[in-house]
From Swiss-Prot:
<feature type="transmembrane region" description="Helical">
    <location>
        <begin position="58"/>
        <end position="78"/>
    </location>
</feature>
<keyword id="KW-0997">Cell inner membrane</keyword>
<keyword id="KW-0739">Sodium transport</keyword>
<comment type="function">
    <text>Na(+)/H(+) antiporter that extrudes sodium in exchange for external protons.</text>
</comment>
<feature type="transmembrane region" description="Helical">
    <location>
        <begin position="153"/>
        <end position="173"/>
    </location>
</feature>
<keyword id="KW-0915">Sodium</keyword>
<feature type="transmembrane region" description="Helical">
    <location>
        <begin position="357"/>
        <end position="377"/>
    </location>
</feature>
<keyword id="KW-0812">Transmembrane</keyword>
<feature type="transmembrane region" description="Helical">
    <location>
        <begin position="256"/>
        <end position="276"/>
    </location>
</feature>
<keyword id="KW-1133">Transmembrane helix</keyword>
<feature type="transmembrane region" description="Helical">
    <location>
        <begin position="94"/>
        <end position="114"/>
    </location>
</feature>
<keyword id="KW-0813">Transport</keyword>
<feature type="transmembrane region" description="Helical">
    <location>
        <begin position="179"/>
        <end position="199"/>
    </location>
</feature>
<dbReference type="InterPro" id="IPR023171">
    <property type="entry name" value="Na/H_antiporter_dom_sf"/>
</dbReference>
<feature type="transmembrane region" description="Helical">
    <location>
        <begin position="124"/>
        <end position="144"/>
    </location>
</feature>
<dbReference type="Pfam" id="PF06965">
    <property type="entry name" value="Na_H_antiport_1"/>
</dbReference>
<keyword id="KW-0406">Ion transport</keyword>
Length: 384
């Protein structure tokens, strides 16, 4: 089995585990164990080094700590793809880049349409712009050879650009009041990591030591701590198939797929339907997220990618048709992990009472988009 097959098989398993974790979270949040579930996530954990101490509830350790490892993996994957993968052919970058951009703009505009008159609600405009690569590849893999491999590659490229956009959005729009001292320390640790690469240090443990120091500095700076993962990834040496980047990526991938993302899903997807009524389903935040994911994503991606397929003969050799493109566009509306993550950033300092609305919108929008996308691809794609 080559690395590409291994990647897609692992992402398929990851999608299934995410689904199971999300379902368990929803069941638990609507059972007599709901109080225990909420208490478990609120338990404080502390880490002390000398005179410095970091104390956070378990939920934030997952969202700020473990998700930094997830972003480290995303950064490694992006760097690898730019150096020698999907994104290395500059002539093929335009289609997934423009498609991802259109898939970002339309959901954001739909969210803004429903929430333009609510300044606090409006802070969640980026929630429906995300695509969950694990879930989307998991859904597509269930269809087997009905979906051309070239479309799976393209879906991955779109998701990578989507992740890049999410990183930029988090850095620009979801950053708190900044601490210049902590930012200065973060810069120092970043320069040290760059120096380690330049002077050909090839010990992962040394990079991780200064990487943890960078994470702490970023955490204290007001910039979201997960971005430290991206910075670390960009400094990791990549000199071919057996490089440190490859070894670190391979080592992290299983931890992310089998532990970090399912744990994140279980901690964040616990939507309680107790007391749910029609007024909650028509809440501007729910409508903006749900319709942004289901309607906005499919419009943006189908119009953009459909144009390239129909008029520019993109993927002509693979006999990709517009029906398949539409199915892929629908599946890209599965925002789940990243949408929930951005939602937690958007309202954490303004109105936490909106988080149930975020979860309802993300769960319903992602579920409908994923189900309809699966059905469209199943009905319209020929068995190959």
């Amino acid at each position: 089995m080559n690395k590409s097959d291994s990647f897609y098989n692992l992402e398929t398993i990851g999608g299934i585990l995410l689904f199971i974790a999300a379902v368990l979270a929803i069941i638990t949040a609507n059972s007599p164990y709901r109080v225990g579930y909420e208490y478990f996530l609120s338990i404080n954990g502390s880490v002390s080094v000398g005179n410095m101490s970091i104390t956070k509830p378990l939920l934030l350790w997952i969202n700020d700590g473990l998700m930094a490892i997830y972003f480290l993996l995303i950064g490694l994957e992006i760097k690898r793809e730019v150096n020698r993968g999907i994104l290395s052919d500059k002539t093929n970058l335009l289609v997934p880049a423009l498609t991802a951009l259109a898939g970002l703009l339309f959901p954001a505009l739909i969210f803004i349409f429903f929430n333009a008159h609510h300044p606090v609600y409006l802070k969640g405009w980026a929630i429906p712009t995300a695509t969950d690569i694990a879930f989307t590849l998991g859904i597509v893999s269930l269809l087997g050879s009905r979906v051309p491999f070239s479309l799976k590659i393209l879906l991955t490229a779109i998701a990578i650009f989507d992740d890049i956009a999410a990183i930029v959005i988090i850095a620009l729009f979801y950053t708190e009041q900044l601490s210049l001292l902590s930012l200065s320390l973060a810069l120092v640790f970043t320069l040290i990591l760059i120096g380690l690469n330049y002077f050909k240090c090839r010990r992962i443990s040394v990079f991780m030591l200064f990487g943890v120091a960078l994470w702490i500095a970023v955490l204290k700076s007001g910039v979201h701590a997960t971005l430290a993962g991206i910075v670390i990834a960009m400094t990791i040496p990549d000199e071919g198939k057996e490089s440190m980047l490859t070894r670190l990526e391979d080592g992290l991938h299983h931890w992310v797929v089998f532990l970090i993302l399912p744990l994140f899903a279980f901690a964040n997807a616990g939507v309680s339907f107790v007391g749910l009524d029609a007024s909650m389903l028509t809440h501007p935040v729910v409508l903006g997220i749900g319709l942004g994911l289901f309607l906005g994503k499919q419009l943006g991606i189908f119009l953009s990618l459909g144009y390239f397929v129909q008029f520019k003969k993109f993927l002509k050799a693979d006999k990709v048709n517009l029906a398949q493109v539409y199915g892929i566009a629908l599946i890209c509306g599965v925002g789940f992990t990243m949408s929930l993550f951005i939602g937690s950033l958007a309202y954490q300092n303004y109105d936490l009472s909106l988080m149930p609305m975020v979860k309802i919108g993300v769960v319903f929008g992602s579920f409908i988009a994923g189900l309809t996308g699966f059905l469209v691809l199943k009905m319209t794609s020929l068995k190959r």
